[in-house]
Each structure stands twice: as structure tokens, then as C-alpha cells.
Amino acid sequence: MEAVTDPALRQLLDSARSSESSRSRAGFGALQRHRTEDATLVGLLADLAECRAFVALTTITGTERRGTISRAGLFGIVLQKSQTDASLIRTAAIASVRSVSHLRLDGDGFPQASTSWPTFVSSHIELGEEISLMVSTQHVTGNVVSLNRSLLILDTPDGGLFYAVVDAIDEVSIRVPGSIRHD
């Protein structure tokens, strides 16, 4: 390839390269803006689950939960609080998410599960299992007696029964299988 020696031709080529570079940067910027415009909470939670990022979540009742999102679905997430404890948190109950590390996520990720909240909950708990749940600001602990798409029934430590509408449950705290309690 021969070097361009004509100053006018060199200036024309340099201008064309500069113009192409500017168009490329503008296109990338437009793509980033478009991806940001498409961001959703579910997409962000999916991105955070994929990164295994440590987060602090605040619920609509003002409760803060810390941990790693291990699974993100359309209607709920699994927040791993420790090796033995996890919380199922309804997506609609999440008010804010703060990542402890500085991550630049677009919030356009795809959820790992598209099941309903009742199906999501039932896939993580068993009859007889001791769980804790939050229904609005009410915290209740007990053993699971029954669970269907509408109601979760707990046998509470005081000998009573607690009936919760599954779609009203904001959070379910569970023990992780493989922990000492389940061995």
C-alpha cells in the first residue's frame, strides 16, 4: 500500500476516518441508551443473579435484606443470606436494590423462571418444614401444614393455625437443603 502524499487527499481520508469513528461512537451510545430504556426490575434482578452480586434489598415495608441473588424469576427471587438460610422474596415487594460492588448492568436480563409466585413458593418449601414469612408487616413462624395456589397454612408455636393468602406473602425464609437441619 502506497503512502498518501497529496495533502488534500490526506485531509479528505482523515476526515472520512474521523466521521466514521464518530458515527460508530454515536451508534454505540444510542444502543446503550436503548438498552437502559428497556431496563426493568426483573431484568436487573436477573443480571444480578447472573453476576452472583452481593446486594441489599429494601422491601416496600422498609425491611432491608442482604445476600446474593441465586435465582431470579418473573414473580420472585431467591436471596441467599448464608450457606444455610435463604429468603424467597416476591418481586412486587421489592422497593429498591443496592449492589455492594460497582456494577454497570443494563437491567435487561432474562429471568431464570417464569412461574407464578404460588408455584415459585411451593417449589421451595415442603410440608412439615419450619419457615418464617412476612405478610405486609406481620412476621409469622411455623410448620407448613398445607399449601396450594391460594392458601398457605402454618402450625404456629402457640398451637394455633395461621392462614396466609399466598399472593399476599412478601417473603418466605427457609433453610437451605443440605444444611444441618435437613441432614
Residue map of PLM features:
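Short glycine-rich, low-complexity segments
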Residues: 1-66, 70-141, 145-183
